[in-house]
Amino acid sequence: MRRLICKRICDYKSFDDEESVDGNRPSSAASAFKVPAPKTPGNPVSSARKPGSAGGPKVGGPSKEGGAGAVDEDDFIKAFTDVPSVQIYSSRELEETLNKIREILSDDKHDWDQRANALKKIRSLLVAGAAQYDCFFQHLRLLDGALKLSAKDLRSQVVREACITVAHLSTVLGNKFDHGAEAIVPTLFNLVPNSAKVMATSGCAAIRFIIRHTHVPRLIPLITSNCTSKSVPVRRRSFEFLDLLLQEWQTHSLERHAAVLVETIKKGIHDADAEARVEARKTYMGLRNHFPGEAETLYNSLEPSYQKSLQTYLKSSGSVASLPQSDRSSSSSQESLNRPFSSKWSTANPSTVAGRVSVGGSKANPLPGSLQRSRSDIDVNAAAGAKAHHAAGQAVRSGRLGAGALNPGSYASLEDTSDKMDGTASDDGRVRAKLSTPLVAVGNAKTDSRGRSRTKMVSQSQPGSRSGSPGRVLTTTALSTVSSGAQRVLVNSASAQKRSKIPRSQGCSREASPSRLSVARSSRIPRPSVSQGCSREASRESSRDTSPVRSFQPLGPGYGISQSSRLSSSVSAMRVLNTGSDVEEAVADALLLGDIRTKKKPARRRYESYGMHSDDDANSDASSACSERSYSSRNGSIPTYMRQTEDVAEVLNRCASSNWSERKEGLLGLQNLLKNQRTLSRIELKRLCEIFTRMFADPHGKVFSMFLETLVDFIQVHKDDLQDWLFVLLTQLLKKMGADLLGSVQAKVQKALDITRESFPNDLQFNILMRFTVDQTQTPSLKVKVAILKYIETLAKQMDPRDFTNSSETRLAVSRVITWTTEPKSSDVRKAAQSVLISLFELNTPEFTMLLGALPKTFQDGATKLLHNHLRNTGNGTQSSMGSPLTRPTPRSPANWSSPLTSPTNTSQNTLSPSAFDYDTENMNSEDIYSSLRGVTEAIQNFSFRSQEDMSEPVRRDPKKEDGDTICSGPGMSDPRAGGDAADGSQPALDNKASLLHSMPLHSSPRSRDYNPYNYSDSISPFNKSALKEAMFDDDADQFPDDLSLDHSDLVAELLKELSNHNERIEERKIALYELMKLTQEESFSVWDEHFKTILLLLLETLGDKEPTIRALALKVLKEILRHQPARFKNYAELTVMKTLEAHKDPHKEVVRSAEEAASVLATSISPEQCIKVLCPIIQTADYPINLAAIKMQTKVIERVSKETLNMLLPEIMPGLIQGYDNSESSVRKACVFCLVAVHAVIGDELKPHLSQLTGSKMKLLNLYIKRAQTGSAGADPTADVSGQS
């Protein structure tokens, strides 16, 4: 009778979760006020509300949602184009129209039909192609507030039009509508619970369109936050939208918010509203498609009743396969890396293996002879309740599931029970135990107040729960025995070292001591230790459990079963059963599984550093707040982050969590993975690097501190795979050194820097530091400057001389360091900068000397003065003769070098003695060093020639040559800059070097001393002029010596190839344009004959690039070509003029300024007649500002034309000027007046007949300007210099 009552109560309780399986749902407005029909416990089926009684459309479908006034997506699509047609003639007209629309929509005092028409006008503009204009997107951002106001309007028609307009914008613009969508979605959600059907359905339809077409991750939190709304209709719709989002979006768009999605769906499955639960279950399938691992973890974290409801829904929708299964490939690095939670039944041999009641299981094993561990990762009480629900009235008796009759992974097994349990054969054919029905009945004698069976082996304790009743332990049933000895489960030996997945006990759960082992103490079987999970080091609490059973050593694992599983099952049997043969046989079975005769030490657990070695903590003391079911519990449960698992994806998900404690746990798990030398795959590394990049800014102190510890291990294990991430790593650590951190945290940052310096190639670090030092996007604080400089200094001490490269970035960085030696705000920066210069000088003296020789004299003086002072302070010798031209080698140079190192020094002598270079590195005293430095100083001051190799460096970088630019350590190798090929350091090479240095007298070429930044724009990265202004460089554009003749054909081909990457590779194309600008000033006629047409067309095409700096640079290059080679434009004058004038309407001032400069040069480069014939039609037909630019250009052309030619062209010139004199733009009118003044200056009174159309006031004004020009009083007017020609 008791069983029948329990069954009825449980069925009544669980029926609510089984309804609405078909997915039908009422409309949002109606369901908000629906009163559920009463249910009678006696007959729950007859009284239940039918799920389809308030039918509605399926989620996300375009069908009508019922009711008068409702709109659907078909209505929206029709309304998109059902608008008045308009035409857009110019961007200015479009801007004016959008401004008017914004004005109307921003003021709710306007009539509602005007606001509705304004919204339609936006759609009209979209249909007319407004999205093709750049200005449209600028004004669209300004419309965000107006659209939000319209969506809040009290007029339903205005709201409807606003929703349609927003949907149309999303459809047309896609992800470009990200900002607008993010702003409008919260307002659209406010429409969902509106009682006016047209408003509610319009808002829902608009959200659907946005989800389908604007895939922006920032929308996900906006949707998930509404899944916990107090409004039931909003929650229902939110899960509907979430389902649509999971169907439509790509996985990469969801990855950032995977944890939020999982948590939201879990809350939805537990939602108080039945229909919201149905919608949440639908989203589970979408989640599984994107994140199978997270979906499986979510499923296993649900209570059995919710698992059953989810399973029932998935079955009804034909998606049983979407439930988690453990036979997925475990090789995937991110999705299924040996998942600890799997749901497949263990069926090694169906004829001999008995099943268990479980939602989770262990992996299937194809080898029937191997042992399989039992599973203990479920709440058996809950499982028994689920079993009672599925049994449909059958009482829970002694029984087992016929696992052999089920397919692997079949969830139908949860619904079946058998009526008896017979003997279970083991792998050697013996029957271990035979349990009868009366034994099981003991466990079913109690039900709780909610009618659920209390049959359980191990419950999942909640914080603060106490299971102190002595009878509680004694009510456990044979299910515990089923999982121990009576029902053996085979396991794969490959998973032998994995611990069982018993859910972690929480907080302060405790069971009173008297009942713990009240039955097991008289057993004749040796009792194993059961203190598993948390040692003293890892546990925060200690146990009061002092029972003798703790003194036993644990069983040695290693024979195919997890020790925690054996312990939990055998101890459960001892606790539950009376002393006798049943207990002994059950425990003996567990002992046989472990084979205690084996003395082999088990493999260490993955998280052993936390005291979690599988047999290290048998005697550990847990705290008084901790019981057998918490951290140090007898069931072997351990904290989540200490599980013996290889699921790296789970660890990474925790590291990426928004919850700080989960991030900390993830870092703990990651530390132990790394300390056990668990290497990560390429995909895992990429994801972890992204997570770590964000963690540099982690706001939680404990997480950041642990992150720094983990980072050290990460670098040590994966240093060979992290070179691509080194820039981020190094720069972020250096920035942190400048932050206000605790001393302990600062020490950890310093340790990470030390490990980084030791782990990566020195040359790579050096290049990154040089790049970071001159990065114009960074504004380092004084502390960061000190950190950078100290790191460079320390790095220089361990670098090999060949690691120091004289590249453009190095030159710029050294210049920056020299400026830091005079930092007025910090003496620490000054000292650190001085130390860096000295370290670099000592690292590679010849190369550093060459570098200083390329810098302006100001920098040379500062550096050499510093080096003199340093040597004067450190040396005890006196200054030697200036005629001793010893050059100083690097102190750390290899001792077996056979050829000398020479620096580009120039001495007061005309010849260099070979003996002067025969020295021993170790025997150089401070006097020699000082003498060497004096020679270096003189060389720098007299240095007026760069080696041809150095000169050609910015033009074409040869990797082989670049490698050779530094000092070589092999025998017979000399500094390539020392003249070359001498393998034995012979006199000819040195004489060649000396003659090279003396080939030009001091200042023989004025340009030889000028520093040109373009010469050093090599392949590392570009540097703009602002970078050089800070270093006070000479910014002339002078180039190489005139006698430098190089074949640039290959280079031009490479540049053209790079420039053809339109809208891509912005930085690389900047470099290419700078290089091209240099080439324009060289007289390489053969190159220009071959490539001019291609260069011109590419430049003109680049004027349409999306990057404004690229457009501006292209105009500057065009200007340089016009200035140096104007004759080549004869056949391309019209095209060039048109493109240059069109650039004047660019929205960026920098581009317009460059266009004005190019037009000015163009006016003086092309023949006047040709130029005027091109300009006249443009002046008459073009709009502002193109016509203004054309008039100004024509004015410049007229100034250089002869009187006869101008008289001939006057009939073509005057109509445009007369027309422009009437223009609505005052600037155009003014430009026409100046142009007429210029014409008058050339031809005089012959102009008057052509002015007959002008009114008296205009003639009067024109005469006034003409008189001013003639008297020279025009001042700054462009006609002021015309008076001499009149």
UniProtKB/Swiss-Prot annotation:
Pfam family, one: CLASP_N
SUPFAM superfamilies for the chain: ARM repeat (SSF48371)
Any one GO biological process: microtubule nucleation
HEAT repeats: 179-214, 215-251, 256-293, 702-739, 764-801, 1046-1083, 1090-1127, 1208-1245
Intervals of motif SXIP motif 2: 523-526
Compositionally biased intervals (Gly residues): 53-67
Keyword line: Cell cycle, Cell division, Cell membrane, Cell projection, Centromere, Chromosome, Cytoplasm, Cytoskeleton, Golgi apparatus, Kinetochore, Meiosis, Membrane, Microtubule, Mitosis, Phosphoprotein, Repeat
Region (Disordered) residue spans: 17-67, 320-374, 411-473, 493-564, 605-638, 870-920, 944-989
Name used for this protein in its record: CLIP-associating protein 2
The encoding gene: Clasp2
